């Protein structure tokens, strides 16, 4: 096809394709592809051969808690003291995590293999004589390598321990066995000791609780789409890989959407947080969005700050993935009060708080109330009902409206009417999923018998050095013991972090993030970390000592084997822990209980090494204490400077108030601590000492002569006390016989045989006049003796004049 194009300059003919359409009388477009240009050439992007389409529709790898930006927004203070720096100075070597040590060993082994291959190639290319010489040199190099390996004792021991790791595991697996028949008989005997509910208690519970309609409903929802949830929320659940609801979610979510009060209980790691967060977000999708509709509608109470941070992360993940316009506010200690008060002025939809900080804002933050609250959720409700939280919880309940919906969740939820009646529930429904089981199915519980408390720490170190090398949480009874064991772990070359109440909020969150990221292998914690925390990848939980309550043991071992995964718990059991051991075995299945035996040689070796580090531990603790005192002094100096420079501003601020007095607050705190400490069993030594004190008499162990002498001394002392008592009685009688006041008359002594004066016992009534200076009793009696009124005749002896008398 030939197209003629006309222009003012010239005519040209172009051969074009059949489907080409042009404009008539258009200007010629001359393109010179071969001429260079001053502009840089833009290369077309090449296709990536490894490109793959995302068939998941924007799905993530699931809800991954911790390891993110939890530390951001925490109130920054002075830089905390890093104990690892002090330990590294003592050791002379840095403390590395297990994966870093393993990576270094793999790199060293790879470099050695490459070196050997190069030497073999050179040996093959040479002559026979040269090969012989090279063989001698190789032997010399091997000798040098061996000598160098002997120089670094730590690396050699680590390599040998890695080689023996499989062997030791096999030996320990052979030593693991079920408990004997005697232990099973003891467990059976404990069944008869357990208290049974009386008929009156059952009747009270039937009247207090409402029946659960989901227990008899065979058509429980097997997917989230069957729950009539909104599309944004379904999209969020799908993107977070929540494919099917767990049993607690399938039963609790439909009831929560109906606005019923719920008591939810299920095993640890079964998704209880999503069970109350999903219906909350669904209800907030249909809230009033008008100008006057903004209000704080949901309150989630948590016993610890870390659990509150985790609940906020779950709620924010669901809201962001679903594109929901829901705002959260985190009210916990350790964060800035002013920032939280500013957030509360914007009226966020969901408040996630700890009780103390919430009451602080209710008392001191202007215009903040809970009058518009629709839903109240108490996570780990059994802990919130214990001593230490009861007063604060009652104060929060008073601030909430009666028409609210209340949901309580815990793995060890109680159904005691006496405790739940404080929360003003409205016909609550018990949603207890598998109440006979409190531990996960994938959990294997192992118990190690400890003969004496002196072998407890060496047994723990032997266990960590031989078998359990990473992703392990170790629970301790006290904060001081957890800190001391962190120093011991550092001296043994084990990378550990601590988590307890003596740390700042920044240190606590940083420890959780480091443990999640694998920077540290062991998390040494108190019961602060036993409830609710969901840390992905925890393989083992070790109980350094058994807790005082079975519920606390359940929450401790529940940090592993979560969401259908496998896990194991190892508990060091002493003689004082036999009762708790029976209870733990009773609630577990027979195939989940194992008896682990740690070789005595390993425990003895660790005990000897621990004795060598005893002085180093004391020096590190002393150095840390001195550093803390220096920082405290600097802080006091800085505080004084601020008081001088900003005195007017500081004193102009309104004082923060509390709903309790100082004594009441301290009493509440002491009650919680006493309840926690009192639940632990007493050690064997202290119990024996108490028995000795009760049995030992005051004459036990004395000879016959000393016994008589002691008895005579006691008799003389008793006689002297009686004589002194008699003398004191005589002195008191003489003192009472004296007049009470100098100006008062002495009482008359009655003669024998005369009758008693009837008016003697009557007190004379004195009125008027001011009190005497000597009147200490304030009776206002007159001074001196007062005579009776009488007429005085001044003309004695004279005759009175009268009418007609005396006149002559």
Curated annotation (Swiss-Prot):
One of its GO terms (molecular function) is RNA helicase activity. Residues 27-46, 64-223, 661-808 are annotated as: Disordered. A motif (Q motif) lies at residues 222-250. Residues 253-431 form the Helicase ATP-binding domain. Residues 90-104, 756-767, 797-808 have a biased composition (Basic residues). Residues 686-703, 741-755, 776-786 have a biased composition (Basic and acidic residues). A motif (DEAD box) lies at residues 379-382. Its EC number is 3.6.4.13. InterPro entries: DEAD/DEAH_box_helicase_dom, DEAD_box_RNA_helicase, Helicase_ATP-bd, Helicase_C-like, P-loop_NTPase, RNA-helicase_DEAD-box_CS, RNA_helicase_DEAD_Q_motif. Disulfide bonds: none annotated. ATP binds at residues 266-273. ATP-binding RNA helicase involved in ribosome assembly. Belongs to the DEAD box helicase family. DDX27/DRS1 subfamily. This is ATP-dependent RNA helicase DRS1. It comes from Cryptococcus neoformans var. neoformans serotype D (strain B-3501A) (Filobasidiella neoformans). The lineage of its organism: Eukaryota, Fungi, Dikarya, Basidiomycota, Agaricomycotina.
